[in-house]
Amino acid sequence: MTLSPERFHHVFANTLGAGESDRLHHRYVVPAPCRLLADLGCAGGPRSPRAVADAGNAARGPLLLISGQEDRLVPGEATRAVYEQYGDTTAVTGPKQFADRAHSLVIDSGWRFVADYALGWLDEHGIRAHLPQD
């Protein structure tokens, strides 16, 4: 299963211009097996037990739930619902919604802003990011 450039733009890159959306489609879109999408709950059916996380695991690493305000694939309500599932844990957890951004927010031309926010969030919680050395 694969996405056409038009469908990619509508679902993933709806806040971008056609040129940037087409470049992202060319670079990142690859066919995916339908079973994978079904396991993730993206095929309209029930989620597979393989796609369920242990929200009560206090020993897990930090979790920053990032979303775009204009995301058509995972709406803000879905991200907030996931955050609420993790709300009772003592593990570091936080939500962040970026205004005027779509699902492509971590791969489009504004990705550095999102990355800087995530690094700052980690720093606020006393967590040092391990950045690659040049």
Model-derived features: positions:
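Helix-rich cap/lid subdomain of alpha/beta-hydrolase
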Residues: 1-31, 35-40
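Alpha-helical elements of Rossmann-like donor-binding domains used by nucleotide-donor carbohydrate transfer enzymes
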Residues: 7, 23, 81, 113, ...
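Short gly/ser/thr-rich secondary-structure transition/capping motifs
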Residues: 41-49
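The feature captures the conserved acid-bearing segment of alpha/beta-hydrolase catalytic domains
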Residues: 49-60
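Short beta-strand/loop motif that positions the catalytic acidic residue
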Residues: 59, 65-67, 71
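Conserved alpha/beta-hydrolase "acid-adjacent" motif
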Residues: 72-81
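Mid/C-terminal beta-alpha module of Rossmann-like enzyme folds, strongest
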Residues: 81-82, 88
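Catalytic active-site module of serine/aspartate enzymes centered on a nucleophile-bearing elbow/loop
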Residues: 89-134
